[in-house]
């Protein structure tokens, strides 16, 4: 293999794929990126056997070929190169030469034949959604995913597809996040899958503000084609808990508030929270919300926030982290809660 490529283009490609690589890889080959040069494209692939990601970037190919390169070393070298034009070539003994006009590195790789093959997906049953919409939906649910490994079924987000409706659900047992969006096409049947949190994080990292995402389902696997990258992941097996009985019916006590003002007030109150005294108190009066916090041996705070509300007075306590996670991910200037 022998190629010429711009440093910034190559570095961008490496950064797209290298995050899936585990720091505790069980096999040396899993610490490497598969680099394949063919048909005017450089294809970069990384996997930890549960999730795989690849991307293709433009390149000047003088000799096609393939090799696997240690990901961190590859990234560190490219990042520090002094020139923008980079030449990469390989020899039969898996030695890789990386050079610019004034700098040269020679490092060892591993044979591309040893790299695990990513699953192939049959065409058909593609679900399409705007990338910006999917990114918004993930932002409004991923914070509620459980990090408790003993509750494996909750370590991901439920994707529920019913005709032309996509619902995302996440819960850690203490809070529940649900969001619905309409798809541009109908699906033939109802589908439910649980996508692991690590895959969600990679999706969030690679989703763009423009363009479509295509979702394909395989045998206990899912593929997300984002155009600039393709992410393939195992799914979490099992049945997600029935969340609908947990969602309370509509309440007459509807409060409208400016999101940013409410967020900042909760953040300030949370400054006095401790592990033993976490709750922030919310007192709801007509057109006024009082956010307060009192912690023994620490201190207290009180702040008033203007709201639109004409109902009865309410006093309630919340873990401020749960409120902040929601408020910082919403985009609307004004929000309503019940």
What residues fall within each predicted segment?
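Structural preference for solvent-exposed beta-strand-turn elements
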Residues: 1-338
């Amino acid at each position: 293999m022998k190629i010429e490529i711009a440093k910034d283009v190559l570095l961008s490609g490496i950064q797209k794929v290298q995050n899936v690589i585990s720091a505790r890889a069980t096999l040396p080959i899993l610490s490497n990126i598969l680099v394949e040069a063919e048909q005017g494209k450089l294809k970069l692939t990384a996997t930890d056997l549960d999730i795989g990601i690849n991307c293709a970037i433009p390149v000047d190919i003088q000799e096609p070929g393939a090799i696997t390169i240690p990901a961190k070393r590859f990234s560190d070298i490219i990042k520090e190169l002094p020139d923008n034009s980079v030449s990469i070539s390989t020899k039969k003994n898996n030695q890789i030469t990386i050079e610019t006009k004034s700098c040269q590195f020679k490092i060892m790789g591993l044979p591309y034949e040893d790299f695990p093959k990513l699953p192939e997906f049959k065409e058909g049953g593609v679900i399409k959604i705007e990338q910006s919409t999917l990114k918004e939906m993930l932002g409004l649910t991923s914070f509620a995913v459980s990090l408790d490994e003993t509750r494996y079924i909750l370590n991901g987000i439920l994707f529920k597809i019913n005709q032309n409706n996509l619902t995302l659900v996440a819960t850690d047992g203490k809070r529940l996040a649900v969001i619905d969006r309409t798809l541009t096409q109908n699906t033939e049947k109802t589908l439910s899958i649980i996508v692991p949190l690590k895959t969600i994080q990679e999706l969030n990292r690679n989703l763009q503000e423009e363009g479509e995402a295509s979702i394909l389902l395989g045998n206990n696997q899912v593929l997300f084609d984002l155009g600039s990258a393709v992410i393939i992941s195992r799914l979490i097996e099992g049945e997600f808990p029935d969340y609908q009985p947990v969602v309370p019916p509509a309440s007459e006590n509807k409060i409208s508030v400016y999101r940013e003002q409410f967020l900042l007030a909760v953040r300030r109150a949370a400054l006095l929270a401790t592990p033993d005294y976490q709750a922030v108190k919310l007192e709801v009066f007509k057109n006024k919300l009082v956010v307060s916090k009192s912690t023994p041996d620490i201190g207290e705070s009180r702040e008033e926030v203007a709201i639109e509300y004409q109902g009865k007075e309410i006093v309630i306590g919340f873990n401020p982290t749960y409120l902040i996670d929601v408020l910082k991910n919403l985009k609307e200037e004004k929000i309503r809660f019940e």
